[in-house]
Amino acid sequence: IEMCYASGIRLVTPDKLNPLYASSYGTGMLMKRSLDEGAKKIILGMGGSATVDGGMGILRALGIKFLTADEKEIIYPKELISLVTIDTSDIDKRLLECEVVVLCDVQNFLLGKEGAAAIFGPQKGATPEMVIALDQGLKNFSEVVSRSIGIDMATVSSGGTAGGAAAGLFAFIDAKLVNGIEYFLDLVDFDTAIKN
């Protein structure tokens, strides 16, 4: 599954890019469809996303609910600052029997000056003010996840890939994060081909 074709920059005209509202939900729907078709392994390419939602959209499509203090469901990245509770009771159980491999094109962490919002937010249409808001939202998301399931999304290498989606999938569905080009070179046994 190529995230750029489901939740990508290429799908939105530059004047319509707005990472405060852009969601990775469509990518999650494709993953769900793959599970419907019986997939036991999903390889997810994460380049070119229009999103900075920490993978919340993908995870929502797979059954996870993100809630405010008054139990209102969070839909947009701009609302992550209000996240208090994460309900995983309805997560798609088929994920337990499916290996998810995330092909990452960067090594950036989720937060801070080298994080998902600061480095990649501007190319997705974020103003400096939006970058601050998105980073604060992702920080809150990371803290709630750490308290809830004991995984620190902020320390995951390549977790900043695709607006933090890599970190979210690592935390909730035990996705394996790998270097995209290295994965494909291994897949085609490139080293052997070069020797021959």
Regions found by a protein language model. Give the residues of each.
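N-terminal loops that bind phosphate or other acidic moieties
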Residues: 1-46, 50-196
